[in-house]
Amino acid sequence: MAEAGARRPFFRRRKTCPFTGPNAPKIDYKDSKLLMRYVSERGKIVPSRITAVSAKKQRELARAIKRARFLGLLPYVIR
């Protein structure tokens, strides 16, 4: 028999990627409003384990953010 105080470990449900699905937004370097949601207060790209973006879409997102920074649409550092 199991111990009286033993509990099952808590498993957090894996979030789904916000860029996959039928009406998901397209990653575009010109869409600075969308890209700002994936940049931290300090201006760093937020990791996929926090945003739940898939690996393929995270690479696309990083490329779009870097492209927007280069063109001056997004800042490199936010003060």
Curated annotation (Swiss-Prot):
Please give the SUPFAM superfamilies that the UniProt record associates with this protein: Ribosomal protein S18
**UniProtKB keywords:** Ribonucleoprotein, Ribosomal protein, RNA-binding, rRNA-binding
Which GO terms of the cellular component aspect does the record hold?
cytosolic small ribosomal subunit
Top-level division of the source organism's lineage? Bacteria
User: One biological process GO term for this chain?
Assistant: translation
Output the Gene Ontology terms for molecular function: small ribosomal subunit rRNA binding; structural constituent of ribosome
Q: Which family does it belong to?
A: Belongs to the bacterial ribosomal protein bS18 family.
Q: A Pfam family matched by this chain, by name?
A: Ribosomal_S18
Residues making up the signal peptide according to the UniProt record: none
Q: What is this protein called?
A: Small ribosomal subunit protein bS18
Its quaternary organisation is: Part of the 30S ribosomal subunit. Forms a tight heterodimer with protein bS6.
Source species, please? Answer: Rhodopseudomonas palustris (strain HaA2)
Q: Record's InterPro entries?
A: Ribosomal_bS18, Ribosomal_bS18_CS, Ribosomal_bS18_sf
Q: What does this protein do?
A: Binds as a heterodimer with protein bS6 to the central domain of the 16S rRNA, where it helps stabilize the platform of the 30S subunit.
